[in-house]
Amino acid sequence: MKKSNTTKALLIGLVLLSGIYSCKKNHPGPQQRFDIGQTNLVADTAGYGAAKIDPALKNAWGIAVNPNGVVWISANHSATSPVYDKTGATLRPPVTIPSVNAGDPGAPTGIVFNGSTDFGGNKFIFAGEDGVLTAWAGGNAAVKVADRSAAGAVYKGLAIATDGGASFLYAANFKGKKIAVFDSNFNLVTTKPFADTSIPADFGPFNIQNIAGMLYVTYAKLKGPENEDDEAGPGNGYVNVFRPDGTLVGRFASTGTLNSPWGITHAPAGFAAPFETILVGNFGDGRINVFSLQGIYIGQLQNNGQTIGIEGLWALDFLKSNATNTDPLFFTAGPHDESHGIFGSLKSTITTTGGSMGNSSGY
């Protein structure tokens, strides 16, 4: 990681921490309008206006990228990981994701890139709804590295972070209503609590994302009686911020416009607002909520005054993480009840209507 990026990440974390415990309000001034144009790069079938068709891209879910800009996607309903460049061009055959038994198809959701020699040197690691973690170091198939299927785990998201100089994986066990933590040898760790008793009992962690060294956890409502999928609806969502040791920093967002939130990312200044923001995507209604770094709600992404809604929206990722990133926002989606898949991008254009919008820390 470049020194400038590290410094920026630390500053973001400090801003977040200061905002959680302050009581100042947001003071809007003259504004600019940020119009967001959508481009569907790849879809699994015709009918979505995508330039490229890849039948493997069914229920496109998590996104991870290596330092060369190569994009890996979890295709949940084809049990594969298609690999593209930033234009959606296929770079290699999709990698097969196994389940509990090697010959059975997996159900990948979250995915992370591992740039270290930890985790057996595997470069891409996947979480699955079958309660299995799989990893890829080469070849045409990932391999199973952890199996919590017997305990009924349903992993919907995955993050990687360091704590005390050691690397860990963090999997959002939706059905189990907890964050499962694994060490660099894929052993389960039980000393990191990730607890918040103020979250209603019928909500579970839907996703987890590392932003500037903090772990953002989104929560969705469990759909009974199986409690394996979410129950979408206005206000059905929470977002918390935790340290990698599992201690709670604070509540970032609650109910309101949240609707089964899954995708979450840090946006550079000039994308959704003149200042840096946190974007939280709703799987429930496909809308993308915009917050200040301190959790102040700003609005939802729009284009020409119309709120953007991407059916089956999953991941949001700028692929590069810095304040001056010029990449568009990349997204994945599983439209038509997750039976199809889209990989696309969102690009911001600015219409000036005055100065910039002021922003101060606070909840």
Where are each of the predicted segments found?
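Bacterial N-terminal signal peptides that target proteins for export
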Residues: 2-10
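C-terminal motif of bacterial Sec signal peptides marking the signal peptidase cleavage site
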Residues: 18-22
